[in-house]
Amino acid sequence: MASEHSAAGAGTDPASAPAPGRARKTAPGRAAKRPRSAADRGKYPFVIGFLIVPLALYAVFVIWPFIQAIYYSFTDWTGLSPDFKMVGFGNYKKMFDDDTFWKSAQHSVTYVVLLPVVVLGIALFLSFMINVGGRRRKGAAIAGVRGSSFYKIVYFFPQVLSIAIVALLFQFAYNPKTGALNSVLRGVRLGSVQPEWLGDPNLALWCIMAVLVWTQVGFFVVLFSAGMASIPSELYEAALLDGAGRFTTFFRLTLPLLWDTVQSGWVYMGILSLGAEAFAVVQIMSVGPGGPADSTTVLPLLVYQKAFGQGQAGYATTIGVALLVITLIFSGLVMRLGRRERLEF
C-alpha cells in the first residue's frame, strides 16, 4: 500500500521534472523554434542594400516618367512652354475621334500580331536546321547543316548595323527608278512590272515590315541556337531510335524545351514592333513620313509628330498612354496564353 501511495504521489506531483539528460517533448502540431543565427539576421539588410539602388534608379527613370506622362495627358501642354492648364478627358475624347490615331493603331496592331509570328517562325526554322537539321555524320547522332557556323555569322550581320543605316539602304533598294529591286525585274525581262514600293499605299506597310523582319531574324537565330545547343543529345538520339522524323522532333522535343525562350522572345519582339525599331524605320523610309496617305503611320511616329511637329505634347502623351496600354495588354496575353508546364532536362 505504501509503495502504491508513493507511486501515485510521484505521478501527480506538479513539481516533478524529467530525468536529467532526457529531452523535453514538444506538443503535437507545434514545431520547435530554431533560434535565428547571425547569418540569418544579416541576410535581409545585405539583400536590401543591393536592391535599393537599382530599384531607386528604376523608379526615377521608368516609373516616374510614366506617372508624368499620365499627368500631362490631362493637360494642354505644348511641350515648349512651362504654362499649361488641365483639360480633363478632352485629349482622350480628341484621340478617340481622330481618324489618324485609329489608322496608326491599326498599323501598330498589325505589326505586333504579325511580326513576332514571322520573325520567330523563320528564326526557329533556321536555328533547327543549323543545329539539328543536317544529315547524320559519323560519330554524331545529330548535326546541323554544313557551314552552320558561317550561317550564324551571316544571319547575325544585320544586328551589327545601325537601324538607320539599314533603313537608308533599303530605301535606295526600293527606289522605283534606280533601286535594286526594279533593276532586277528589268534584268529578268519583267520591265512591265515596276512597283512603286514605298510610294504605293497598298505595298508601303508590307515593304517596311519586310525590313523589320530582315533586321531581327538574326538575333533570334543566335538566341534559339544557343538554347538548342544546350539540349542533351541523348534526347535526340532517343527520338531517332523511336523513329521520329524532323517534323516530329521539332514539335514534340525541341519546341517544348525552348518554350520559355520563345515566350520571352515573343514579348521582346512585340515591344520592338510597338517601339523604337518601328518608329525609326517608318520615319526614315516612308513618304511624308507616314505616307502615302497615312498608310504607314504607327503610334510611335504619331506621338513624335504631335509632340515635336505640331506642339501638342499633352495630346502626344495621351497617345503614348494608349500605346502603353496596348503594350501591357499584348504582354499579358502572351504570358497568359503561352503559359504551360515547365519542362526541365
Model-derived segments and their meaning:
Residues 1-41:
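Short, Lys/Arg-rich, polar N-terminal cytosolic tail immediately upstream
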Residues 43-345:
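A structural signal for multi-pass alpha-helical bundles of membrane permease subunits
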